[in-house]
UniProtKB/Swiss-Prot annotation:
Recorded family membership: Belongs to the protein kinase superfamily. Ser/Thr protein kinase family.
Ligand binding (ATP): 151-159, 181
Gene3D superfamilies in alphabetical order: Phosphorylase Kinase, domain 1 (3.30.200.20), Transferase(Phosphotransferase) domain 1 (1.10.510.10)
Protein name: non-specific serine/threonine protein kinase
Domain of life the protein comes from: Eukaryota
InterPro entries from the UniProt entry: Kinase-like_dom_sf, Prot_kinase_dom, Protein_kinase_ATP_BS, Ser/Thr_kinase_AS
Function, as annotated: Probable serine/threonine protein kinase that forms a complex with the N-terminal peptide of the chiffon protein and may be involved in regulating meiotic processes in the male testis.
Entry's Gene Ontology cellular component terms: Dbf4-dependent protein kinase complex; nucleus
GO biological process: mitotic DNA damage checkpoint signaling
Alphabetized PANTHER family for the sequence: CDC7 KINASE, ISOFORM A-RELATED, OVARIAN-SPECIFIC SERINE/THREONINE-PROTEIN KINASE LOK-RELATED
Length: 665
């Protein structure tokens, strides 16, 4: 062998010795012994044949056999003892490492368990506190109901789960469950009376929650309402499919249509005030604490405007009424256990809506693989940063803006502007933010549109400004400055803006948030990159030109056929619900007649829209032909039985005393 080969073999031997010694945790001793071995071998011979034999010796020495032992070499007893020592101590090192890992895992598990137990104890403390407060405030409750647990709480009230004491002997599935809403003593009596009036006169039908009875003891009031199991909107809004979203919105609009027939504005339509059971499909609109009635002249009737005669009429109707029994077949114990289980699951995790908007649901994994395989941590970080940049663009507001003085009336004769601003931030329409006094039921329609926007975009909450000025800026950043300026002018208001803002396309905005990983895939980014590695950006929406969100974009856009699960009519309904001008905004009754709620609009992912429309048209033609043949052979009785349905009217009445409630519920 020449000198180069000898040097190469020596370098490999030194590296192998070091790695072997490090792996056994005995680098110091083994390195010293190896140096001694090198000295002895170098003095043994200097010819090339001797070097070759020495290299072969070291190579054979560090090759383990299948049995875990090392090959024996004559004249190397000292090194063989070291090999046996290393092999004996290797299992000991591995065992110590495993013990340390088990100890660390045990410590982490104990910390996690202690955190869960602390949260459970805190929940139990709040539960016991709510039960004790209800029992002390209204002692009559203990004579009628078995109160189990707290199922909800708010600023003005606490809701608890209860069952009738006289039904203790029944099977658990046959016991009726009730939601006991205990109003805080700080709650204004007019608010309680308004909510009671709405539930008594409006509720009980058309997806609107009703009331069984009302119990009053001194200054404390409790509403007894039917109980329904429901899912948290935050847990299901990204996993709902197209039929479920359509049914959800249909039920919401049915409830709003019924409420608006009584010239009542709910004013607090939001997901937390909607009880929706995904398994059963049941739906209820609740919480009428902010509801307001519209007068004949179009103005909103304030609570203080109610005359004593109207108040006496309401109380008289409540006093003369009788209770209504509502049956339900769910188990109270099962519902309480499910509720506590959901609370524990929520305590274990969470996750922000921005992160979920970037990562997407599991179903998008196939699209991600088609777009270009797996993403690195850097790609995910870039996607999140881009999504946050878009959110900041939508929620941009000047830091110098005064949140308390941003609306100016064009009529200088009016010194002050008095308008109702009740509602939840993020769901208030432009007319409320502009403090327009003559508000209508279009306020609730806008809130329904915001809920639909969250369902289609997969982003909740979509609007989250801390004050009215920021909320109006969010609306301007999405719908442009000109529609808001025109609406403000029609409402006798004036808006001053520092710059113009273009209108964004609602469909592309929803697609951008719902399928963020697809539009931000590295392969698509490289597809539209310039030679210098940069990407052309749109100056208006601050997005890449291939993913421009402007409504009248002239850029070369990336196509998304087969990616969107919603038809075009869904975004048409969304634009009508979110009409900036309240006078042009669609009503709940008109929205129910929209083609979006027709069964013919079904979208299959992966198939272009024009092919799906052709298939749906052919299927519709075949179904119409079959129905025509079937009806031509129908007799009159069978046709009547198919079209006519029996209608039974159950009058809704109420009782106001605890004794009557105990005997009539």
């Amino acid at each position: 062998m020449d000198k180069k080969e000898v040097q190469h073999h020596r370098s490999q031997q030194a590296m192998t010795k070091s790695l072997y010694a490090i792996g056994m945790g005995l680098l110091g001793k083994s390195a010293t012994n190896m140096d001694c071995a090198n000295t002895n071998l170098e003095s043994a011979g200097k010819s090339s044949s001797t070097n070759y034999n020495r290299n072969r010796f070291y190579n054979e020495r560090f090759v383990p056999m299948a049995s875990g032992t090392m090959p024996s070499v004559s004249g190397t007893n000292h090194h063989s003892r070291h090999q046996q020592l290393l092999l004996q101590q290797a299992p000991k090192c591995t065992a110590d490492l495993n013990e340390k890992l088990v100890k660390i895992n045990r410590q982490n598990a104990n910390k996690e368990l202690s955190t869960i137990q602390a949260k459970d104890m805190q929940s139990v403390d709040k539960n016991e506190e709510a039960l004790k407060e209800l029992q002390e405030s209204i002692p009559e409750i203990n004579k009628i109901f078995d109160v189990h647990c707290r199922i909800g709480s708010g600023t003005f009230s606490t809701v608890l789960l209860g069952t009738l004491q006289r039904e203790r002997g029944l099977v658990e599935t046959q016991r009726r469950r009730f939601a006991i809403k205990h109003h805080n003593p700080t709650n204004h009596p007019e608010r309680i009376l308004r909510e009671l009036e709405c539930m008594y006169r409006i509720g009980g039908v058309e997806n609107v929650i009703g009331i069984n009875c009302c119990i009053r003891y001194n200054d404390n009031v409790a509403f007894i309402m039917p109980y329904m199991t429901h899912d948290r909107f935050h847990d299901i809004y990204r996993s709902l499919n197209f039929p479920e979203i359509r049914d959800y919105l249909r039920n919401l609009l049915i409830a709003l249509r019924h409420v608006h027939k009584f010239n009542v504005i709910h004013r607090d339509v939001k997901p937390s005030n909607i009880l929706y059971n995904r398994r059963t499909g049941k739906f209820l609109l609740c919480d009428f604490g902010l509801a307001q009635r519209i007068a004949d002249d179009g103005s909103v009737v304030q609570s203080s405007d109610l005359s004593s005669r109207e108040v006496f009429s309401i109380l008289r109707d409540l006093e003369n009424g009788r209770s209504v029994t509502l049956t339900d077949g769910n188990s109270a114990q099962a519902e309480a256990e499910d509720y506590m289980a959901r609370r524990r699951m929520r305590a274990l995790g969470g996750g922000g809506s921005v992160e979920r908007a970037v990562t997407g649901p599991p179903s998008i994994q196939k699209l991600r693989e088609q777009a270009g395989g797996h993403l690195t941590k850097k790609d995910v970080a870039n996607q999140r940063a881009d999504t946050m940049r878009l959110l900041n663009r939508l929620r941009l507001v000047s830091p110098n803006a005064d949140p308390n003085n941003y609306v100016v009336s064009t009529n200088t004769s009016k010194k002050e502007m008095h308008a109702s601003r009740a509602g939840t931030p993020g769901y208030r329409p432009p007319e409320v933010l502009l403090r327009y006094p003559k508000q209508s039921t279009a306020v609730d329609v806008w809130a329904a549109g915001v809920i639909m926007l969250s369902l289609l975009s997969g982003l909740h909450p979509f609007f989250k400004a801390p004050h009215d000025c920021g909320a109006l800026a969010e609306i301007i950043n999405l719908f442009g400055d000109m529609p808001v300026r025109k609406t403000a002018f029609l409402l006798d208001r004036l808006i001053l803006l520092a710059q113009k803002v273009n209108t964004l396309d609602l469909r592309r905005v929803c697609m951008r948030f719902r399928h963020a990983d697809f539009f931000l895939a590295p392969e698509i980014q490289r597809k539209y990159q310039r030679p210098d590695g940069t990407t052309e950006m749109c100056r208006s929406c601050e997005q890449p030109t291939f993913n421009c969100l402007c409504s009248n974009s002239g850029h070369n856009l990336e196509r998304y056929d087969g990616l969107d699960i919603f038809p075009a009519v869904a975004y048409d309904l969304l634009s009508r619900l979110l009409e900036v001008n309240p006078q042009k905004r669609i009503t709940a009754e008109e929205a129910l007649k929209h083609p979006f709620f027709s069964d013919q609009h079904r979208i299959t992912p992966g198939i272009p829209l024009h092919q799906q429309q052709l298939i749906m048209h052919q299927q519709q033609h075949i179904m119409q032909h079959q129905q025509h043949l079937q009806r031509s052979r129908e007799t009159l009785p069978s046709s009547a039985a198919r079209t006519l349905k029996a209608f039974v009217c159950y009058p809704m009445e109420i009782t106001s005393t605890a004794s009557q409630a105990a005997g009539n519920i």
